[in-house]
Amino acid sequence: MLRTILDAPQRLLKEGRASRQLVLVVVFVALLLDNMLFTVVVPIVPTFLYDMEFKEVNSSLHLGHAGSSPHALASPAFSTIFSFFNNNTVAVEESVPSGIAWMNDTASTIPPPATEAISAHKNNCLQGTGFLEEEITRVGVLFASKAVMQLLVNPFVGPLTNRIGYHIPMFAGFVIMFLSTVMFAFSGTYTLLFVARTLQGIGSSFSSVAGLGMLASVYTDDHERGRAMGTALGGLALGLLVGAPFGSVMYEFVGKSAPFLILAFLALLDGALQLCILQPSKVSPESAKGTPLFMLLKDPYILVAAGSICFANMGVAILEPTLPIWMMQTMCSPKWQLGLAFLPASVSYLIGTNLFGVLANKMGRWLCSLIGMLVVGTSLLCVPLAHNIFGLIGPNAGLGLAIGMVDSSMMPIMGHLVDLRHTSVYGSVYAIADVAFCMGFAIGPSTGGAIVKAIGFPWLMVITGVINIVYAPLCYYLRSPPAKEEKLAILSQDCPMETRMYATQKPTKEFPLGEDSDEEPDHEE
Protein backbone atom coordinates (compact mmCIF):
# COMPACT_ATOMS: atom_id res chain seq x y z
CA MET A 1 0.00 0.00 0.00
CA LEU A 2 2.78 2.40 0.97
CA ARG A 3 4.69 1.58 -2.20
CA THR A 4 1.57 2.26 -4.26
CA ILE A 5 1.18 5.68 -2.66
CA LEU A 6 4.85 6.51 -3.22
CA ASP A 7 4.69 5.37 -6.84
CA ALA A 8 1.53 7.37 -7.58
CA PRO A 9 3.28 10.68 -8.42
CA GLN A 10 5.72 8.92 -10.73
CA ARG A 11 2.87 7.07 -12.43
CA LEU A 12 0.90 10.30 -12.90
CA LEU A 13 3.98 12.01 -14.27
CA LYS A 14 4.53 9.18 -16.75
CA GLU A 15 0.91 9.37 -17.88
CA GLY A 16 1.18 13.14 -18.18
CA ARG A 17 4.21 12.90 -20.44
CA ALA A 18 2.28 10.58 -22.73
CA SER A 19 -0.73 12.91 -22.87
CA ARG A 20 -1.22 15.07 -25.95
CA GLN A 21 -3.58 17.33 -24.01
CA LEU A 22 -0.86 18.29 -21.52
CA VAL A 23 1.53 19.05 -24.38
CA LEU A 24 -1.17 21.37 -25.72
CA VAL A 25 -1.46 23.01 -22.29
CA VAL A 26 2.30 23.63 -22.18
CA VAL A 27 2.28 25.25 -25.62
CA PHE A 28 -0.85 27.25 -24.76
CA VAL A 29 0.74 28.70 -21.60
CA ALA A 30 4.04 29.45 -23.37
CA LEU A 31 2.29 31.37 -26.16
CA LEU A 32 0.09 33.13 -23.60
CA LEU A 33 3.04 34.49 -21.60
CA ASP A 34 5.04 35.35 -24.70
CA ASN A 35 2.25 37.47 -26.12
CA MET A 36 1.33 39.04 -22.79
CA LEU A 37 4.90 40.31 -22.58
CA PHE A 38 4.70 41.22 -26.27
CA THR A 39 1.71 43.54 -25.80
CA VAL A 40 2.05 44.69 -22.19
CA VAL A 41 4.71 47.19 -23.28
CA VAL A 42 2.50 48.76 -25.98
CA PRO A 43 0.72 51.29 -23.71
CA ILE A 44 3.64 51.60 -21.27
CA VAL A 45 6.59 52.55 -23.50
CA PRO A 46 5.25 55.75 -25.15
CA THR A 47 4.08 57.31 -21.89
CA PHE A 48 7.10 56.03 -19.95
CA LEU A 49 9.54 57.61 -22.40
CA TYR A 50 7.47 60.80 -22.35
CA ASP A 51 7.56 60.91 -18.55
CA MET A 52 11.25 60.07 -18.31
CA GLU A 53 12.77 62.10 -21.14
CA PHE A 54 10.47 64.92 -22.23
CA LYS A 55 9.69 66.15 -18.72
CA GLU A 56 13.27 65.58 -17.56
CA VAL A 57 14.64 67.78 -20.35
CA ASN A 58 12.21 70.61 -19.64
CA SER A 59 12.53 70.49 -15.84
CA SER A 60 16.33 70.58 -16.02
CA LEU A 61 16.10 73.50 -18.44
CA HIS A 62 13.91 75.55 -16.11
CA LEU A 63 16.15 74.83 -13.14
CA GLY A 64 19.09 76.13 -15.14
CA HIS A 65 17.30 79.34 -16.08
CA ALA A 66 16.07 79.91 -12.54
CA GLY A 67 19.59 79.75 -11.16
CA SER A 68 21.21 81.86 -13.84
CA SER A 69 18.97 84.92 -14.24
CA PRO A 70 15.69 86.01 -12.63
CA HIS A 71 15.09 88.25 -15.64
CA ALA A 72 14.93 85.19 -17.89
CA LEU A 73 11.77 83.93 -16.18
CA ALA A 74 9.94 87.16 -16.82
CA SER A 75 10.93 87.27 -20.46
CA PRO A 76 8.55 85.71 -22.99
CA ALA A 77 11.44 84.88 -25.35
CA PHE A 78 12.24 81.40 -26.63
CA SER A 79 15.55 79.59 -26.14
CA THR A 80 16.99 76.40 -27.56
CA ILE A 81 18.71 73.38 -26.08
CA PHE A 82 20.18 70.31 -27.74
CA SER A 83 18.15 67.19 -26.94
CA PHE A 84 20.39 64.33 -25.81
CA PHE A 85 17.99 61.57 -26.88
CA ASN A 86 17.29 62.24 -30.56
CA ASN A 87 19.91 64.80 -31.68
CA ASN A 88 17.34 67.54 -32.32
CA THR A 89 17.09 71.12 -31.14
CA VAL A 90 14.27 71.85 -28.69
CA ALA A 91 12.69 75.30 -28.56
CA VAL A 92 11.27 76.06 -25.11
CA GLU A 93 9.01 78.93 -24.06
CA GLU A 94 10.50 80.07 -20.78
CA SER A 95 7.45 81.89 -19.48
CA VAL A 96 5.22 78.78 -19.47
CA PRO A 97 5.50 77.04 -16.06
CA SER A 98 4.93 73.55 -17.38
CA GLY A 99 7.68 73.84 -19.97
CA ILE A 100 5.98 73.12 -23.27
CA ALA A 101 8.55 72.08 -25.87
CA TRP A 102 8.45 72.07 -29.63
CA MET A 103 10.88 70.14 -31.79
CA ASN A 104 12.79 71.88 -34.60
CA ASP A 105 15.35 70.53 -37.00
CA THR A 106 17.35 73.79 -37.06
CA ALA A 107 19.01 75.94 -34.46
CA SER A 108 16.70 78.90 -35.12
CA THR A 109 14.24 79.88 -32.40
CA ILE A 110 10.81 79.75 -34.03
CA PRO A 111 8.02 80.66 -31.58
CA PRO A 112 5.27 78.03 -31.39
CA PRO A 113 1.67 79.16 -31.75
CA ALA A 114 0.06 80.17 -28.49
CA THR A 115 -3.23 78.57 -29.49
CA GLU A 116 -1.67 75.09 -29.36
CA ALA A 117 -0.65 75.52 -25.73
CA ILE A 118 -4.06 76.90 -24.77
CA SER A 119 -5.84 74.07 -26.58
CA ALA A 120 -3.63 71.48 -24.89
CA HIS A 121 -4.47 72.82 -21.44
CA LYS A 122 -8.19 72.96 -22.18
CA ASN A 123 -8.34 69.38 -23.41
CA ASN A 124 -5.92 67.94 -20.83
CA CYS A 125 -3.71 66.74 -23.67
CA LEU A 126 -0.09 65.82 -23.17
CA GLN A 127 2.08 68.81 -23.98
CA GLY A 128 4.83 68.74 -26.55
CA THR A 129 3.18 67.24 -29.61
CA GLY A 130 6.43 67.72 -31.49
CA PHE A 131 8.13 65.35 -29.06
CA LEU A 132 5.44 62.74 -29.71
CA GLU A 133 5.94 63.03 -33.46
CA GLU A 134 9.68 62.50 -33.08
CA GLU A 135 9.19 59.74 -30.52
CA ILE A 136 6.93 57.65 -32.75
CA THR A 137 9.91 56.48 -34.80
CA ARG A 138 11.92 55.40 -31.76
CA VAL A 139 8.94 53.60 -30.26
CA GLY A 140 8.39 51.80 -33.56
CA VAL A 141 12.03 50.70 -33.72
CA LEU A 142 11.82 49.44 -30.13
CA PHE A 143 8.72 47.39 -30.86
CA ALA A 144 10.17 46.05 -34.11
CA SER A 145 13.45 44.95 -32.50
CA LYS A 146 11.79 41.88 -31.00
CA ALA A 147 10.45 40.73 -34.35
CA VAL A 148 13.72 41.49 -36.15
CA MET A 149 15.71 39.38 -33.71
CA GLN A 150 13.13 36.61 -33.93
CA LEU A 151 13.43 36.84 -37.71
CA LEU A 152 17.19 36.31 -37.51
CA VAL A 153 17.05 33.42 -35.02
CA ASN A 154 14.17 31.41 -36.56
CA PRO A 155 16.16 29.93 -39.49
CA PHE A 156 18.53 28.35 -36.97
CA VAL A 157 15.86 27.15 -34.51
CA GLY A 158 13.89 25.19 -37.14
CA PRO A 159 16.76 22.87 -38.20
CA LEU A 160 17.88 22.67 -34.55
CA THR A 161 14.53 21.18 -33.52
CA ASN A 162 14.89 18.61 -36.30
CA ARG A 163 18.24 17.56 -34.81
CA ILE A 164 17.60 17.54 -31.05
CA GLY A 165 13.80 17.56 -30.80
CA TYR A 166 11.40 20.15 -29.45
CA HIS A 167 11.84 19.80 -25.69
CA ILE A 168 15.21 21.49 -25.13
CA PRO A 169 14.50 24.51 -27.40
CA MET A 170 11.13 24.94 -25.68
CA PHE A 171 12.75 25.12 -22.24
CA ALA A 172 15.53 27.39 -23.52
CA GLY A 173 12.82 29.76 -24.72
CA PHE A 174 11.33 29.87 -21.22
CA VAL A 175 14.69 30.73 -19.61
CA ILE A 176 15.38 33.57 -22.05
CA MET A 177 11.84 34.92 -21.73
CA PHE A 178 12.14 34.98 -17.94
CA LEU A 179 15.39 36.97 -18.10
CA SER A 180 13.82 39.40 -20.56
CA THR A 181 10.78 39.94 -18.33
CA VAL A 182 12.92 40.71 -15.27
CA MET A 183 15.02 43.11 -17.34
CA PHE A 184 11.90 44.96 -18.50
CA ALA A 185 10.84 45.40 -14.87
CA PHE A 186 14.01 47.22 -13.87
CA SER A 187 14.93 49.06 -17.10
CA GLY A 188 14.88 52.84 -16.78
CA THR A 189 16.33 53.94 -20.12
CA TYR A 190 15.53 53.46 -23.78
CA THR A 191 18.72 51.44 -24.30
CA LEU A 192 17.90 48.89 -21.60
CA LEU A 193 14.33 48.58 -22.87
CA PHE A 194 15.72 47.94 -26.35
CA VAL A 195 18.03 45.18 -25.07
CA ALA A 196 15.18 43.55 -23.12
CA ARG A 197 12.91 43.64 -26.17
CA THR A 198 15.63 42.11 -28.34
CA LEU A 199 16.25 39.35 -25.79
CA GLN A 200 12.53 38.61 -25.79
CA GLY A 201 12.73 38.01 -29.55
CA ILE A 202 15.30 35.25 -29.06
CA GLY A 203 13.21 33.50 -26.40
CA SER A 204 10.04 33.88 -28.42
CA SER A 205 11.69 32.25 -31.43
CA PHE A 206 12.55 29.13 -29.44
CA SER A 207 9.12 28.90 -27.81
CA SER A 208 7.01 29.52 -30.93
CA VAL A 209 8.86 27.28 -33.38
CA ALA A 210 9.33 24.42 -30.93
CA GLY A 211 5.78 24.70 -29.58
CA LEU A 212 3.98 24.68 -32.94
CA GLY A 213 6.27 21.97 -34.30
CA MET A 214 5.60 19.83 -31.24
CA LEU A 215 1.84 20.17 -31.70
CA ALA A 216 2.06 19.24 -35.38
CA SER A 217 4.09 16.14 -34.50
CA VAL A 218 1.71 14.83 -31.82
CA TYR A 219 -1.52 15.72 -33.66
CA THR A 220 -1.03 13.90 -36.95
CA ASP A 221 -4.68 13.88 -38.04
CA ASP A 222 -5.47 17.07 -39.96
CA HIS A 223 -8.84 17.69 -38.26
CA GLU A 224 -7.34 17.24 -34.79
CA ARG A 225 -4.34 19.35 -35.73
CA GLY A 226 -6.63 22.17 -36.82
CA ARG A 227 -8.44 22.11 -33.49
CA ALA A 228 -5.17 21.92 -31.52
CA MET A 229 -3.67 24.82 -33.48
CA GLY A 230 -6.82 26.83 -32.86
CA THR A 231 -6.59 26.15 -29.13
CA ALA A 232 -2.88 27.03 -29.02
CA LEU A 233 -3.51 30.22 -30.97
CA GLY A 234 -6.19 30.90 -28.37
CA GLY A 235 -3.34 31.19 -25.87
CA LEU A 236 -1.68 33.66 -28.20
CA ALA A 237 -4.97 35.55 -28.47
CA LEU A 238 -5.52 35.55 -24.72
CA GLY A 239 -2.04 37.00 -24.25
CA LEU A 240 -2.84 39.75 -26.71
CA LEU A 241 -6.20 40.24 -24.99
CA VAL A 242 -4.83 40.61 -21.48
CA GLY A 243 -1.46 42.23 -22.22
CA ALA A 244 -2.24 45.78 -23.32
CA PRO A 245 -5.14 46.52 -20.89
CA PHE A 246 -3.26 44.81 -18.06
CA GLY A 247 -0.16 46.90 -18.77
CA SER A 248 -1.98 50.22 -19.04
CA VAL A 249 -4.00 49.75 -15.84
CA MET A 250 -1.05 48.45 -13.79
CA TYR A 251 1.23 51.24 -15.03
CA GLU A 252 -1.38 53.90 -14.24
CA PHE A 253 -2.26 52.71 -10.73
CA VAL A 254 0.69 50.59 -9.48
CA GLY A 255 3.86 51.37 -11.45
CA LYS A 256 5.99 50.22 -14.35
CA SER A 257 7.65 47.24 -12.67
CA ALA A 258 4.47 45.58 -11.37
CA PRO A 259 3.13 43.99 -14.59
CA PHE A 260 6.55 42.61 -15.53
CA LEU A 261 7.17 41.09 -12.09
CA ILE A 262 3.78 39.35 -12.23
CA LEU A 263 4.64 37.97 -15.67
CA ALA A 264 8.01 36.78 -14.37
CA PHE A 265 6.25 34.82 -11.61
CA LEU A 266 3.87 33.24 -14.14
CA ALA A 267 6.85 32.35 -16.32
CA LEU A 268 8.39 30.44 -13.41
CA LEU A 269 5.21 28.38 -13.10
CA ASP A 270 5.38 27.63 -16.82
CA GLY A 271 8.99 26.53 -16.43
CA ALA A 272 8.03 24.13 -13.65
CA LEU A 273 5.28 22.70 -15.87
CA GLN A 274 7.74 22.19 -18.71
CA LEU A 275 10.19 20.42 -16.40
CA CYS A 276 7.48 17.95 -15.42
CA ILE A 277 5.95 17.30 -18.84
CA LEU A 278 8.59 17.84 -21.51
CA GLN A 279 11.80 16.36 -20.05
CA PRO A 280 13.98 19.20 -21.44
CA SER A 281 17.20 17.29 -20.76
CA LYS A 282 16.20 14.56 -23.22
CA VAL A 283 17.54 14.75 -26.78
CA SER A 284 14.93 13.29 -29.16
CA PRO A 285 15.75 13.98 -32.80
CA GLU A 286 13.19 13.35 -35.51
CA SER A 287 13.31 9.82 -36.93
CA ALA A 288 12.99 11.12 -40.49
CA LYS A 289 15.26 13.72 -42.05
CA GLY A 290 13.32 16.92 -42.63
CA THR A 291 13.13 18.80 -45.90
CA PRO A 292 15.85 21.50 -46.02
CA LEU A 293 14.69 25.00 -45.16
CA PHE A 294 15.68 26.46 -48.53
CA MET A 295 13.74 23.72 -50.32
CA LEU A 296 10.63 24.69 -48.37
CA LEU A 297 11.21 28.35 -49.25
CA LYS A 298 11.07 27.41 -52.94
CA ASP A 299 7.58 25.95 -52.53
CA PRO A 300 5.17 28.60 -53.91
CA TYR A 301 2.24 27.31 -51.85
CA ILE A 302 4.17 27.67 -48.59
CA LEU A 303 5.19 31.18 -49.66
CA VAL A 304 1.57 32.16 -50.37
CA ALA A 305 0.51 30.92 -46.93
CA ALA A 306 3.44 32.70 -45.27
CA GLY A 307 2.61 35.94 -47.09
CA SER A 308 -0.96 35.76 -45.85
CA ILE A 309 0.26 35.42 -42.25
CA CYS A 310 2.72 38.29 -42.73
CA PHE A 311 0.39 40.90 -44.24
CA ALA A 312 -2.59 40.11 -42.02
CA ASN A 313 -0.56 40.45 -38.82
CA MET A 314 1.14 43.56 -40.17
CA GLY A 315 -2.27 45.21 -39.81
CA VAL A 316 -2.23 45.05 -36.02
CA ALA A 317 1.56 45.35 -35.78
CA ILE A 318 1.54 48.72 -37.48
CA LEU A 319 -1.09 49.97 -35.01
CA GLU A 320 0.94 49.16 -31.89
CA PRO A 321 3.41 52.08 -32.00
CA THR A 322 1.23 54.50 -33.98
CA LEU A 323 -2.29 54.19 -32.55
CA PRO A 324 -1.45 55.14 -28.91
CA ILE A 325 0.48 58.23 -30.02
CA TRP A 326 -2.26 59.17 -32.52
CA MET A 327 -4.80 58.86 -29.67
CA MET A 328 -2.61 61.04 -27.43
CA GLN A 329 -2.47 63.70 -30.15
CA THR A 330 -6.03 63.68 -31.51
CA MET A 331 -8.19 62.28 -28.69
CA CYS A 332 -6.17 63.46 -25.67
CA SER A 333 -6.61 59.96 -24.24
CA PRO A 334 -5.43 59.15 -20.69
CA LYS A 335 -2.90 56.38 -20.12
CA TRP A 336 -5.40 53.66 -19.26
CA GLN A 337 -7.27 54.12 -22.56
CA LEU A 338 -4.15 53.51 -24.65
CA GLY A 339 -4.17 49.82 -23.79
CA LEU A 340 -7.94 49.39 -23.70
CA ALA A 341 -8.14 50.53 -27.33
CA PHE A 342 -6.69 47.13 -28.30
CA LEU A 343 -9.20 45.20 -26.17
CA PRO A 344 -11.84 44.72 -28.93
CA ALA A 345 -9.19 43.38 -31.31
CA SER A 346 -7.90 40.94 -28.72
CA VAL A 347 -11.35 39.66 -27.70
CA SER A 348 -12.41 39.14 -31.31
CA TYR A 349 -9.07 37.47 -32.12
CA LEU A 350 -9.65 35.03 -29.26
CA ILE A 351 -13.12 34.28 -30.64
CA GLY A 352 -11.85 34.02 -34.21
CA THR A 353 -9.04 31.55 -33.53
CA ASN A 354 -11.28 29.18 -31.55
CA LEU A 355 -14.31 29.49 -33.81
CA PHE A 356 -12.56 29.21 -37.15
CA GLY A 357 -10.12 26.55 -35.94
CA VAL A 358 -13.12 24.23 -36.47
CA LEU A 359 -15.14 26.09 -39.12
CA ALA A 360 -12.21 26.78 -41.44
CA ASN A 361 -11.81 23.08 -42.20
CA LYS A 362 -15.49 22.84 -43.19
CA MET A 363 -15.74 26.01 -45.28
CA GLY A 364 -12.26 25.67 -46.78
CA ARG A 365 -9.19 27.16 -45.15
CA TRP A 366 -8.24 29.04 -48.30
CA LEU A 367 -11.65 30.76 -48.36
CA CYS A 368 -11.50 31.54 -44.64
CA SER A 369 -8.12 33.19 -45.10
CA LEU A 370 -9.23 35.10 -48.21
CA ILE A 371 -12.26 36.56 -46.42
CA GLY A 372 -10.11 37.34 -43.39
CA MET A 373 -7.63 39.40 -45.39
CA LEU A 374 -10.45 41.37 -47.05
CA VAL A 375 -11.91 42.17 -43.62
CA VAL A 376 -8.44 43.17 -42.32
CA GLY A 377 -8.10 45.68 -45.14
CA THR A 378 -11.60 47.09 -44.67
CA SER A 379 -11.15 47.44 -40.89
CA LEU A 380 -7.87 49.32 -41.29
CA LEU A 381 -9.52 51.76 -43.70
CA CYS A 382 -12.12 52.54 -41.00
CA VAL A 383 -9.66 53.20 -38.12
CA PRO A 384 -8.88 56.87 -39.00
CA LEU A 385 -12.61 57.67 -39.02
CA ALA A 386 -12.77 57.30 -35.22
CA HIS A 387 -13.00 60.50 -33.14
CA ASN A 388 -12.84 58.84 -29.71
CA ILE A 389 -12.07 55.48 -28.16
CA PHE A 390 -15.61 54.25 -28.79
CA GLY A 391 -15.18 54.82 -32.51
CA LEU A 392 -12.27 52.37 -32.47
CA ILE A 393 -14.35 49.46 -31.14
CA GLY A 394 -15.83 48.41 -34.49
CA PRO A 395 -12.68 48.60 -36.65
CA ASN A 396 -10.48 46.96 -34.03
CA ALA A 397 -13.00 44.17 -33.40
CA GLY A 398 -13.21 43.45 -37.12
CA LEU A 399 -9.43 43.51 -37.37
CA GLY A 400 -8.96 41.00 -34.56
CA LEU A 401 -11.63 38.61 -35.84
CA ALA A 402 -10.16 38.70 -39.35
CA ILE A 403 -6.59 38.04 -38.18
CA GLY A 404 -7.94 35.15 -36.12
CA MET A 405 -9.50 33.74 -39.30
CA VAL A 406 -6.19 34.00 -41.16
CA ASP A 407 -3.99 32.55 -38.41
CA SER A 408 -6.30 29.64 -37.54
CA SER A 409 -6.45 28.74 -41.25
CA MET A 410 -2.85 29.22 -42.30
CA MET A 411 -1.08 27.52 -39.38
CA PRO A 412 -2.69 24.10 -40.04
CA ILE A 413 -2.24 24.60 -43.80
CA MET A 414 1.52 25.00 -43.29
CA GLY A 415 1.69 21.62 -41.57
CA HIS A 416 -0.60 20.01 -44.15
CA LEU A 417 1.47 21.35 -47.06
CA VAL A 418 4.52 19.64 -45.55
CA ASP A 419 2.53 16.42 -45.22
CA LEU A 420 1.44 16.64 -48.86
CA ARG A 421 4.56 17.86 -50.60
CA HIS A 422 7.55 17.20 -48.32
CA THR A 423 8.76 15.10 -45.38
CA SER A 424 6.46 15.23 -42.35
CA VAL A 425 8.96 17.01 -40.07
CA TYR A 426 7.58 20.33 -38.94
CA GLY A 427 10.33 22.38 -37.29
CA SER A 428 11.45 24.19 -40.44
CA VAL A 429 8.00 24.93 -41.83
CA TYR A 430 6.85 26.48 -38.57
CA ALA A 431 10.08 28.44 -38.49
CA ILE A 432 8.95 29.86 -41.84
CA ALA A 433 5.49 30.57 -40.41
CA ASP A 434 7.04 32.35 -37.44
CA VAL A 435 9.38 34.28 -39.76
CA ALA A 436 6.32 35.46 -41.71
CA PHE A 437 4.63 36.50 -38.47
CA CYS A 438 7.78 38.33 -37.37
CA MET A 439 8.22 40.09 -40.70
CA GLY A 440 4.81 41.63 -40.20
CA PHE A 441 5.76 42.79 -36.72
CA ALA A 442 9.19 43.99 -37.90
CA ILE A 443 8.25 45.85 -41.07
CA GLY A 444 5.04 47.32 -39.63
CA PRO A 445 6.33 49.16 -36.55
CA SER A 446 9.71 50.11 -38.03
CA THR A 447 8.23 51.74 -41.14
CA GLY A 448 4.97 52.92 -39.60
CA GLY A 449 6.53 55.78 -37.67
CA ALA A 450 8.38 57.12 -40.70
CA ILE A 451 5.24 56.92 -42.86
CA VAL A 452 3.18 58.74 -40.22
CA LYS A 453 5.76 61.55 -40.08
CA ALA A 454 5.82 61.80 -43.88
CA ILE A 455 2.15 61.57 -44.90
CA GLY A 456 0.13 61.06 -41.70
CA PHE A 457 -1.62 58.28 -39.79
CA PRO A 458 -4.74 58.04 -42.04
CA TRP A 459 -2.66 57.38 -45.15
CA LEU A 460 -0.69 54.71 -43.29
CA MET A 461 -3.96 52.89 -42.63
CA VAL A 462 -5.00 53.25 -46.28
CA ILE A 463 -1.71 51.79 -47.55
CA THR A 464 -1.78 48.80 -45.17
CA GLY A 465 -5.46 48.11 -45.83
CA VAL A 466 -5.06 48.18 -49.61
CA ILE A 467 -2.08 45.79 -49.41
CA ASN A 468 -4.24 43.22 -47.59
CA ILE A 469 -7.15 43.60 -50.02
CA VAL A 470 -4.89 43.22 -53.06
CA TYR A 471 -3.09 40.15 -51.62
CA ALA A 472 -6.28 38.32 -50.58
CA PRO A 473 -7.08 36.68 -53.98
CA LEU A 474 -3.76 34.80 -53.87
CA CYS A 475 -5.26 32.58 -51.15
CA TYR A 476 -7.32 30.93 -53.91
CA TYR A 477 -4.19 29.06 -55.00
CA LEU A 478 -4.28 27.17 -51.67
CA ARG A 479 -7.65 25.67 -52.62
CA SER A 480 -6.16 22.53 -54.19
CA PRO A 481 -2.37 22.36 -53.96
CA PRO A 482 -0.96 19.32 -55.78
CA ALA A 483 0.72 16.60 -53.74
CA LYS A 484 3.77 14.58 -54.64
CA GLU A 485 2.68 11.18 -55.91
CA GLU A 486 4.33 9.10 -53.22
CA LYS A 487 2.99 11.37 -50.45
CA LEU A 488 -0.53 11.23 -51.87
CA ALA A 489 -0.34 7.43 -51.97
CA ILE A 490 0.46 7.25 -48.26
CA LEU A 491 -2.15 9.81 -47.29
CA SER A 492 -4.83 8.12 -49.41
CA GLN A 493 -4.30 4.89 -47.47
CA ASP A 494 -4.21 6.51 -44.03
CA CYS A 495 -6.97 9.10 -44.30
CA PRO A 496 -8.63 9.23 -47.72
CA MET A 497 -11.06 12.00 -46.69
CA GLU A 498 -8.15 14.29 -45.89
CA THR A 499 -6.65 14.21 -49.35
CA ARG A 500 -9.79 14.54 -51.44
CA MET A 501 -9.50 18.31 -51.85
CA TYR A 502 -5.77 18.05 -52.45
CA ALA A 503 -5.87 15.36 -55.14
CA THR A 504 -4.04 16.00 -58.39
CA GLN A 505 -5.73 15.77 -61.79
CA LYS A 506 -5.10 12.05 -61.80
CA PRO A 507 -7.93 10.08 -60.08
CA THR A 508 -6.98 8.88 -56.60
CA LYS A 509 -8.34 5.41 -57.26
CA GLU A 510 -5.14 4.58 -59.18
CA PHE A 511 -3.10 4.98 -55.99
CA PRO A 512 -1.19 3.49 -54.29
CA LEU A 513 1.17 3.06 -57.17
CA GLY A 514 1.62 -0.44 -58.46
CA GLU A 515 4.14 -2.00 -60.77
CA ASP A 516 2.07 -1.04 -63.81
CA SER A 517 2.28 2.65 -63.03
CA ASP A 518 6.00 3.08 -62.41
CA GLU A 519 6.34 5.29 -65.45
CA GLU A 520 3.49 7.59 -64.44
CA PRO A 521 5.32 9.69 -61.82
CA ASP A 522 8.01 10.61 -64.33
CA HIS A 523 5.29 11.63 -66.72
CA GLU A 524 3.54 13.72 -64.08
CA GLU A 525 6.73 15.38 -62.83
Swiss-Prot record:
Phenotypic consequence of R138L: Found in patients with bipolar disorder; decreases the vesicular uptake of noradrenaline, dopamine and serotonin
Nucleotide-binding in keyword set: no
Region (Disordered) residue spans: 503-525
Phylogenetic placement of the source organism: Eukaryota, Metazoa, Chordata, Craniata, Vertebrata
Documented effect of changing I136T: Decreases the vesicular uptake of noradrenaline, dopamine and serotonin; may predispose carriers to a increased cortical response to negative stimuli and reduced threat-related amygdala reactivity
GO annotation (BP), single: serotonin uptake
Domain of life: Eukaryota
Compartments it resides in: Cytoplasmic vesicle, Secretory vesicle membrane; Cytoplasmic vesicle, Secretory vesicle, Synaptic vesicle membrane
CDD domains: MFS_SLC18A1_2_VAT1_2
Name of this chain's protein: Chromaffin granule amine transporter
Membrane topology summary: Multi-pass membrane protein
Keywords annotated in UniProt: Cytoplasmic vesicle, Endoplasmic reticulum, Glycoprotein, Membrane, Neurotransmitter transport, Synapse, Transmembrane, Transmembrane helix, Transport
Residues modified by glycosylation: N58, N87, N104
UniProt-listed NCBIfam families: 2_A_01_02
A GO cellular component annotation in the UniProt record: presynapse
Membrane spanning stretches: 22-42, 139-158, 168-188, 198-218, 228-250, 257-279, 300-319, 336-360, 366-386, 398-418, 423-443, 449-470
